[in-house]
């Protein structure tokens, strides 16, 4: 993926990076050098080192060495201008940018300056972690490192770079989920929808384990709240999964255990308002319906798991 860009400054990208830094667009100095943040008065590379992202101070021409550290660099707009104020609204392509990020699937994107974020999403962000995400990629906004932002003290900008480095370490979370199958072989799933991006996906019933809870405690609570289901036996663990994803401005590393639960039949009747949890629907699915529908299903191998346990 590295270098595949319509700009004179190549993207520094690879699949599965920890963080991609996103500037607003190439300035003339960067375009001439074919390197990101190449203006010697730009503090990006110094801040990257002082915040602990790089073991030493890198030169802009060493930008592809960032990939070895799990880091990348791109721009919100590709057109070179004397300054970011010379950009037009049409220089930003949100759909193309999101496709670029989904293809790379990093843990996070850090926008170097509010204007890079604003140009893409037409929103005025605060500095720090954002509630918006792109798929399973979290978003973070840093102060600009441009010499035009020199009025913001270096130590203040360094504080935000350091906060980003700490934020990139996800919060560990234990979770339990139910592979709930009825006598017809249907599976009970909940539909999540991100409140800002609109990304939607279906997942098995379940959730995080609260302090002091056992798997059974948490699973009974979740099934009662999400489906009104109370009369059931909890079976063995039939699948485990680990996933890192953004939620409500945090990065979560979730350890999930899936218990097999068989029921005769059940009419779904949630006992709480699920909208604040991001849940928009709870329903039974047949394997044929799951195969035919187009929205994302988590875990990706759910059909295989169902078939392996549909005795």
Where are the model-predicted features located?
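C-terminal capping/extension of enzyme domains
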Residues: 1-18, 39-40, 47, 83-98, ...
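Short N-terminal binding/cap micro-motifs at the start of the first secondary-structure element
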Residues: 17, 27-32, 197-199
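Short, well-ordered beta-to-alpha junction loops that form the rim of enzyme active sites
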Residues: 24, 111-116, 192-193
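Short, surface-exposed acidic-centric catalytic microdomains
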Residues: 30-90
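Conserved N-terminal beta-strand and adjoining loop/helix that marks the start
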Residues: 48, 169-187, 208-211
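Internal catalytic-core helix/loop-beta-alpha segment
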Residues: 68-123
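A generic hydrophobic-segment detector
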Residues: 114-169, 268-311
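Unchanged
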Residues: 131-132, 209-233, 241-297
């Amino acid at each position: 993926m590295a270098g595949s860009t319509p700009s004179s400054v190549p993207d520094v990208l690879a699949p599965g990076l920890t963080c991609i830094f996103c500037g607003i667009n190439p300035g003339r100095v960067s375009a001439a050098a074919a390197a990101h943040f190449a203006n010697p008065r730009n503090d990006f590379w110094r801040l990257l080192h002082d915040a602990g992202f790089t073991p030493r101070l890198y030169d802009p021409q060493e930008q592809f060495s960032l990939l070895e550290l799990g880091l990348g660099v791109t721009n919100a707009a590709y057109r070179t201008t004397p300054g970011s104020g010379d950009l037009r609204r049409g220089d930003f392509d949100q759909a193309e940018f999101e496709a670029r990020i989904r293809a790379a699937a990093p843990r996070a994107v850090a926008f170097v300056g509010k204007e890079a974020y604003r140009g893409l999403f037409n929103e005025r962000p605060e500095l720090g972690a954002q509630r918006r995400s792109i798929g399973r990629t979290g978003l973070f906004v840093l102060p600009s490192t441009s010499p035009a932002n020199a009025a913001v003290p270096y130590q203040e900008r360094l504080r935000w770079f350091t906060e980003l480095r700490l934020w990139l370490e996800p919060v560990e979370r234990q979770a339990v989920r139910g592979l709930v199958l009825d006598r017809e072989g249907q599976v009970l799933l909940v539909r999540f929808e991100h409140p800002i991006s609109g990304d939607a996906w279906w997942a098995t019933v379940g959730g995080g384990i609260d302090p002091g809870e056992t798997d059974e405690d948490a699973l009974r609570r979740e099934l009662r709240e999400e489906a009104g289901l109370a009369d059931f036996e909890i079976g063995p663990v039939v699948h485990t999964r680990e996933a890192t994803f953004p939620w409500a401005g945090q990065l979560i590393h979730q350890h999930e255990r899936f218990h097999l639960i068989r029921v005769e039949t059940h009419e779904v009747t949630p006992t709480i308002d699920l909208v604040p949890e991001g849940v928009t629907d709870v329903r039974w699915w047949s394997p044929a319906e799951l195969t035919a529908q187009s929205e994302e299903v988590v875990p990706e191998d759910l059909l295989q798991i169902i078939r392996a346990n549909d005795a």
